[in-house]
Every structure is written in C-alpha cells, then in structure tokens.
C-alpha cells in the first residue's frame, strides 16, 4: 500500500488545546495514522502519514473546524510508513524561536510564490531590479543535504540561534531583497517577521517552503535534496525518498557514498560516529 505523507501548519490562536488534543489523538488513532502533531497557543504543526483514505479523512475532520478551514497540506508519497508512532503534543510554540512577541497570526511577511521566485532567480533580480538573496533558516545539517544555489546560511544548530545570527549580519542585506526559506514554510515565516521587526525592508518568505517549490517548479536553482524529519531523511525534487540516510546513533546525515564505508552499519553506527570516537580518543 502506498503511504501518503502530509505536512501542514497554521498560525492561529488555540485556547482549547487541552480538549483539542484528546479529540485529535482519537481521530488519528481511529485512522491508524502515524506522525507528530504539535498544538501551541500560536497554532498547529502537522506531520502525518497513512493511507489515502485516512489522510483525506483527518484533513476533512480538521477543516470542519473554522480555524483550520483553509489548511493546505503538502503531500508526498512513500512505499513505507516513515513514522514509528503517533504523537499529539502540547507545546509552548509550534516552532521554537523564544521570541514570544512574534505572532504570525497578527501579521506576516509577504509570501513569494515558487513560480515568482524562479522567475526572479532566472532573471537575476526582483521586479524592482534589486539583487535577490536566498536565506536558509534551517539547521546546518539540513543545509548539508541540499539548498538553493548561493544561499546564505549561518550553520545554526537550532532555530533559537537564528535571531542573533541575523542581527550580526543585518547590514549585509542593505538594498537587497531577502527571501527566507525552510522545508515547509513554518520557520521562514517566523524568520521573515523577525527580520522585518529588526528593520530589514525588502523581506519575503518562500510560500510553502522547499517542498512547495519542488512540487510547483522542480529543482531549478536548487542543489541536492531536501532534508525531512522522518525515516525518509531526504526527498528529491520529485518528492520521492532520496539517497541520504540519518544515523540513529549520532543523528548525522550519511550520504550514499558514506553508506559504502565499512564504518556504516544501518541503525548502529556511521563514519561520523567513527570520526567522533577518533577525536575523543586524541
């Protein structure tokens, strides 16, 4: 059976999280769905996988709630269930930035459709003639799997490191158009709002993130694959599982070439583990 994988989020005030959680959990369990759903005062973040009928059912159930009526999941397919279990969790934020005054529901940075971004990158500037800078808001290990050509990234280890990183480099973007991007849109949405608040003037977020870009325009101007937080590890431009795997011991991303190493034993260790051990021994 082919598995349908969806990711979706929405920034919307949720004051009934304590009652919404058990109801949503029961609906997911009844449909044998696996994955993770986060509920926070600022909204919902969804990663679920299951049969077509089950996915359509849970999306329909959510959209029956007026707050989620415009929920727009991004889909991909896989031959196997990429999640081991189902979690519906209550969190302080659906993506942790630790800047509580940033409330995307109250106003967001302009979103840029993938087709428009491709056109800007094709022509080398935006419609006003400004240089376009692609800003990767993801963690360094995600960037290593693939990113937009010539994108700026800061090698952050977690999203809470983004605000100080962008503050230190704010002047680099004077007179330029900045397009923030991430996997599915949630991090770059918060990042774009933050950049506006610190005074950057020409800021956009890539609508739907890398996955939406792949879906609508393919891999033009993008090198590599897109890291995803499930057992598929990475998706290619066709939204199919790609070659990289994640080591379950050290969490490093293992390339197809590294998987040929004698140090790679699936589920146990990888060449990065061996490197860590060698450095620890010196």
From Swiss-Prot:
Keywords: Oxidoreductase, tRNA processing. It holds the Pfam family UPF0176_N. CDD domains: RHOD_YceA. It is an enzyme of class 1 (oxidoreductase). SMART domains: RHOD. The active site is at 182 (cysteine persulfide intermediate). GO terms for molecular function: oxidoreductase activity, acting on paired donors, with incorporation or reduction of molecular oxygen. GO terms for biological process: tRNA modification. It catalyses: uridine(34) in tRNA + AH2 + O2 = 5-hydroxyuridine(34) in tRNA + A + H2O. Gene3D superfamilies: 3.30.70.100, Rhodanese-like domain. Its EC number is 1.14.-.-. Residues 128-222 form the Rhodanese domain. InterPro entries: Rhodanese-like_dom, Rhodanese-like_dom_sf, TrhO, TRHO_N. Belongs to the TrhO family. This is tRNA uridine(34) hydroxylase. It comes from Ralstonia nicotianae (strain ATCC BAA-1114 / GMI1000). The gene is trhO.
